[in-house]
Amino acid sequence: MSISSNMVKVAVVGGEGIGPEVTAQSRRILDWFAARRSLPMTLREAQYGLIPYLATGKVLPDDTVEAMDEADAILWGATGGPETKEVPPAARKAGSLLSLRSKYDLYANLRPIVASPALSDSSPLKAEVLKDVDFVIIRELTSGIYFGEPRGIEILPDGQRRGFNTEQYTTSQIRRVARSAFELARTRRNAVCSVDKANVLETSVLWREEVMALHREEFSDVELTHLYVDNAAMQIVREPRQFDVMVTGNIFGDILSDCAAMASGSLGMLPSASFGPVDRFGRRKALYEPVHGSAPDIAGKGIANPLGSILSVAMMLRLTLNRPDDADLLEEAVQTALAAGARTADIAGPGAKKLSTAEMGDAVLGALEMVAGRAREHA
């Protein structure tokens, strides 16, 4: 999923709610790697949301669109919150995250689920359940019920209102995301679990048939299993370590990844990466963002957990910048900071000191210096 260009262009879009706060800490991490590890990239900050709307009439102003169009990778913060009520629905829809996923065809969404030993007390799951949990959910991101037409709310002849949506998938939409899952599994523990609801949904019948056909034709060396989505949710809670790579449709992946977040201790810990198709130069547009939303209840208070965004930078280092050693370094620094007791409010136990968003950024930067120093000593 990496690109071959020597200089990578990154657009940094903080967005709304806590997005700018957590993204500011990720920007500090990127600046550290640029200065200390000669990271080959250029950064361009851009705005999204109510502020640019009030100035330009667009939640995605032209300069932000230009920055994202030119970027190899987009570091995204969050969208949504009370301020959305001040933006007309048509303007909000035109610049929505769903519209960006569609525009750039970001069809494969990767959400790593890793249980940190340091956070075993922060999860509602038992420590023995969390042991060795390390899997990835690949969610199809540009099709399914979130994009299907027709959709809407109508008035029936008897005066009742009816809401309706359309769930649909095609062979190519299923196969390309399944291919991403099989290819990723080959670099991990070589096992894919495909999740559907083929016992009641025709789209899931097609999903399972196409995943099985692709497996038979191109990936017979990879172990393939299938689960219905309700069973998958239960298995994620019962024994999450059984999974390596899980692939599923848009709405199922949306729900299951939030369920799986409890294995990491908090939704604020989860990173993600979304990829488009490979272009003629061998590059893939990528959008990196924390899984959490805009959290308007804590926006502006400086207490949000930036680790989901920071770990999204680690994914960027590995998957777009082709710097796996730097990605490992950053992930180790995060674990080092957590092991030393660094906690924001969402992962802090009773009586524990609660760091601000910026203080957690400080803790990770300090751990980076420590971990990088150890690496130099052993080089």
Each predicted region: which residue ranges?
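Glycine-rich phosphate/diphosphate-binding loop of Rossmann-like nucleotide-binding domains
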Residues: 11-28, 32-34, 157-230, 239-242
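Buried hydrophobic positions in well-ordered alpha/beta secondary-structure cores of metabolic enzymes
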Residues: 16-19, 72, 138, 181, ...
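Generic secondary-structure signature for well-ordered alpha-helical cores
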Residues: 31, 35-38, 70-73, 102-109, ...
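N-terminal beta-loop-helix "entrance" segment that forms/cooperates
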Residues: 36-62, 234-236
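Glycine-rich phosphate/nucleotide-binding loop
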Residues: 52, 237-342
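N-terminal glycine-rich phosphate/adenylate-binding segment common to multiple enzyme folds
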Residues: 54-164, 251-253
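Glycine-rich phosphate/pyrophosphate-binding loop and the adjoining helix
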Residues: 142-143, 148-188, 192, 198-200, ...
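Accessory "access/gating" subregions that flank catalytic or transport cores
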Residues: 199, 207-271, 368, 372
